[in-house]
């Protein structure tokens, strides 16, 4: 099973084969490939029914057309018998059910498997050009819920189905239901746990070869998608499209509950979960649930003792490279993400977004019990304690409740006497990382952030800035 990629639907000729084609045949080839590229974004999530190794065994795997005969320059030069495999069955299979009768083109008597394939074939036979994307022409099919426009009616239908709320396809193994057959097939592969495609460099395994190809770019550094406006390059097409919308400001997905506009479908789905509270990703070890799969993957690493990323300045270790990089910015004082309104700098883009809500007044978190709206999820959780009378995370020893699991874990260490942070210089053990960092300053007598007035050194830039304000008050 494989995601549809450009390589899967492209038609390739050798130089010798290309030389045998006439001008009209070459024009036909260009036309078909242009349409394929334009619609690749619509079809990229359609999954194949069978493994790659079976794709040539099944006679239904290829859709054969004799368009060359219809598009040759001279009527006398037709009937060449040449066939071209234009689009793999992975695309048209979505509209072909078992036992479906083949369709016949009234124009040229060619027998074609599948109504979708027939419609596409008739358009080419008649010379009719399908609707194109907005930059090329009109998009006649508009999604009523999201307001997104599509060039093809079948693309519109496939996008429209998930919003009906009906989930007709059920997994017999776990009982989970899905809105489309392809999502069920995708789930079944993941449920089976078989990952046959392995990276030769690091050994990581994947369900589909397309995911393996994408992963390999993290090793090679290949970035084939380049932004025409700022020349920034991206390894994945989805990343490139998200970046492009930053320039255009395009946000085609609108939330029904709060009217917030979002640039892509994945952001839209994640945002919807902030309203519904849905957390479909559950940790098998502790049962904790998450709204996005990346959060689950990050959480799962906390069950392993391995923390490969260590800060050389304070000795703190991390499970993730991203967390380590954020931590290092606190030492260096690097704040590359600036607020567009007031210019204030932050070390993370998420903090900029939170800060900008102060200017815009946006409050996306609404309490269902009293109707109060809040700008940040942390404020929302604190507010909910007023209604519930406690946090969701309780100490196993004394029963004290906490809003955050990290605070609860830190509290539990005070009962157990656990002190995981050990100073390599004097052997002293401490229970919290903040205490350990303060202790390390006693040995070094120095920190990377120095006061511009008196030269005193600090571990954190925020503490240094707070100290500098004491000098400023003295001058008043």
Curated annotation (Swiss-Prot):
Organism of derivation: Homo sapiens
A GO BP entry: regulation of transcription by RNA polymerase II
Localisation: Nucleus
Keywords: DNA-binding, Metal-binding, Nucleus, Repeat, Transcription, Transcription regulation, Zinc, Zinc-finger
Source lineage: Eukaryota, Metazoa, Chordata, Craniata, Vertebrata
Name of the featured protein: Zinc finger protein 563
Pfam family, one: zf-C2H2
PANTHER family the UniProt entry points to: C2H2-TYPE DOMAIN-CONTAINING PROTEIN, ZINC FINGER PROTEIN ZIC AND GLI
Family named by the database record: Belongs to the krueppel C2H2-type zinc-finger protein family.
PROSITE patterns per UniProt: KRAB, ZINC_FINGER_C2H2_1, ZINC_FINGER_C2H2_2
Main location: nucleus
Family annotation (InterPro entries): GLI_C2H2-zinc-finger, KRAB, KRAB_dom_sf, Znf_C2H2_sf, Znf_C2H2_type
MF term (GO), any: RNA polymerase II transcription regulatory region sequence-specific DNA binding
Function summary: May be involved in transcriptional regulation.
Zinc finger (C2H2-type): 101-125, 169-191, 197-219, 225-247, 253-275, 281-303, 309-331, 337-359, 365-387, 393-415, 421-443, 449-471
Domain KRAB: 4-96
Domain of life: Eukaryota
């Amino acid at each position: 099973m494989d995601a549809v990629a450009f390589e899967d639907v492209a038609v390739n000729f050798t130089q010798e084969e290309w030389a045998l084609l006439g001008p009209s045949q070459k024009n036909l080839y260009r036309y078909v490939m242009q349409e394929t590229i334009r619609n690749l974004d619509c079809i990229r999530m359609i999954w194949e029914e069978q493994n790659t190794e079976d794709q040539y065994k099944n006679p239904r795997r290829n859709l054969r057309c004799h368009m060359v005969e219809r598009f040759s320059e001279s009527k006398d030069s037709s009937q060449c018998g040449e066939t071209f495999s234009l689009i793999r069955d992975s695309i048209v299979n979505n509209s072909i059910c078992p036992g479906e009768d083949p369709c016949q083109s009234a124009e040229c008597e060619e027998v074609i498997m599948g109504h979708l394939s027939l419609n596409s074939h008739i358009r080419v036979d008649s010379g009719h050009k399908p609707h194109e994307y907005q930059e090329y022409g009109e998009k006649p099919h508009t999604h009523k819920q999201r307001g997104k426009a599509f060039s093809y009616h079948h693309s519109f239908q496939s996008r429209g189905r998930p919003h009906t709320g009906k989930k007709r396809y059920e997994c017999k193994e776990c009982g989970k239901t899905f809105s489309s057959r392809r999502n069920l097939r995708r789930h079944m592969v993941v449920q089976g746990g078989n990952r046959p495609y392995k990276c030769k460099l690091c050994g990581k395994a994947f369900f589909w070869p397309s995911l393996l190809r994408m992963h390999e770019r993290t090793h090679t550094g290949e970035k084939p998608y380049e932004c025409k406006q700022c020349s920034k390059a991206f390894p994945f097409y989805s990343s490139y499209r998200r970046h492009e919308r930053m320039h255009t400001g395009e946000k085609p997905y609108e939330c029904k509950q709060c009217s917030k506009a979002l640039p892509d479908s994945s952001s839209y789905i994640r945002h919807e979960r902030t309203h519904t509270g849905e957390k479909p990703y559950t940790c098998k070890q502790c049962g904790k649930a998450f709204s996005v799969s990346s959060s689950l993957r990050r959480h799962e690493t906390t069950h392993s003792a391995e923390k490969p990323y260590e800060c050389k300045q304070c000795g703190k270790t991390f499970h993730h490279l991203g967390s380590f990089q954020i931590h290092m910015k606190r030492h260096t004082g690097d704040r590359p993400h600036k607020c567009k309104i007031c210019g204030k700098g932050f070390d993370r883009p998420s903090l900029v977004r939170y800060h900008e809500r102060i200017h815009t007044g946006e409050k996306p978190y609404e309490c269902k019990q009293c109707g109060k709206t809040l700008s940040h999820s942390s404020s929302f959780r604190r507010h909910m304690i007023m209604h519930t009378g406690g946090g969701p995370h309780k100490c196993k020893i004394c029963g004290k409740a906490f809003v955050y699991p990290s605070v609860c874990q830190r509290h539990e260490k005070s009962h157990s006497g656990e002190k995981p942070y050990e100073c390599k210089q004097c052997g002293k053990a401490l229970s919290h990382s903040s205490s350990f960092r303060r202790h390390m300053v006693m040995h070094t007598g120095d920190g990377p952030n120095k006061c511009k007035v008196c030269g005193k050194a600090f571990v954190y830039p925020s503490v240094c800035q707070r100290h500098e304000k004491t000098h400023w008050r003295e001058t008043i």
